[in-house]
Amino acid sequence: MSEPLKPRIDFAEPLKEEPTSAFKAQQTFSEAESRTFAPAAIDERPEDEGAAEAAVDAALRPKRSLWRKMVMGGLALFGASVVGQGVQWTMNAWQTQDWVALGGCAAGALIVGAGVGSVVTEWRRLWRLRQRAHERDEARELLHSHSVGKGRAFCEKLAQQAGIDQSHPALQRWYAAIHETQNDREIVGLYANLVQPVLDAQARREISRFAAESTLMIAVSPLALVDMAFIAWRNLRLINRIATLYGIELGYYSRLRLFRLVLLNIAFAGASELVREVGMDWMSQDLAARLSTRAAQGIGAGLLTARLGIKAMELCRPLPWIDNDKPRLGDFRRQLIGQLKETLQKSKSSPEK
């Protein structure tokens, strides 16, 4: 008799929905679970990467200014004048039977021919470096295209440029996976997942080796001048190795241009990531207290070499990065720290023995 009366329900009116709470249920984590908690990964500065890509594209495209055209026209006119004067000297020497002058003309012709040949070779290698950027843009378009007929020829051209033989197991798996009903996006995606990782794995090994050598060299070397020369030499060697792996033959000017583009890309997008990666380890593992100053400098030099290799890999790679296949600086960071700590432990244990 003490229960309250329930409200009246009128069936002629629509039922009222009970309001649901907007709050989620409470979750309680144990102490063991809280230790293994890992924060979610955050995308790495899309704005900075976009600015870096725009700067690289602008640097790759030749600037067609008026002064450039005037200089090129003047050089062409000077070259034509030199050739004409050389032909006239040769004719006069032949008519007067001046064999000494004729020999000098022949030697000059050989020197000019060698110079023209080297200029043409350098221009062709520089054009090949620029062409790689256009191939990357074409691959990006094919990865978002539903057309048919271009993907297979494009991928076969990339395999030929990289020196991958037709009997290579990765290329054979790609041939077995594609069929006529697939569009260009699917064919290029299969190439990126089956064939391209073969070259990427070789480039990663080269980056790891060169970064480890830079780290150990800086950690044990007492001379700053020797350190600078060694790092510069090894970084240039690393760029040459990565370019060769991806089928790009570098000349003098193309090597300088690629090195400039890599440094430009690092200046745009690499500084904040490098500081974050180094700071993460120093704060979490207290490396500043465990390692010496030279060892810390070695880790910094190794990370810079790894960053240089990653950007050179990105510029020489014929395909854009897909999903999460881009190498992370943190992967090389952990490897460098482990190798350096192992080397320091061996050096400390050897005098005791």
Curated annotation (Swiss-Prot):
Residue spans crossing the bilayer: 70-90, 100-120, 213-233
Keyword annotations: Cell inner membrane, Cell membrane, Membrane, Transmembrane, Transmembrane helix
Protein's cellular compartments: Cell inner membrane
Topology relative to the membrane: Multi-pass membrane protein
Gene behind this protein: ycjF
Taxonomic superkingdom: Bacteria
InterPro entries: DUF697, UPF0283
Compositionally skewed regions (Basic and acidic residues) per UniProt: 1-19
Periplasmic side: 1-69, 121-212
Annotated protein name in UniProt: UPF0283 membrane protein YcjF
Segments for region (Disordered): 1-35
One Pfam short name: DUF697
PANTHER family reported in the protein's UniProt record: UPF0283 MEMBRANE PROTEIN YCJF
Keyword Cell inner membrane belongs to the record: yes
Family assignment from sequence similarity: Belongs to the UPF0283 family.
GO cellular component assignments: plasma membrane
Positions on the Cytoplasmic side per record topology: 91-99, 234-353
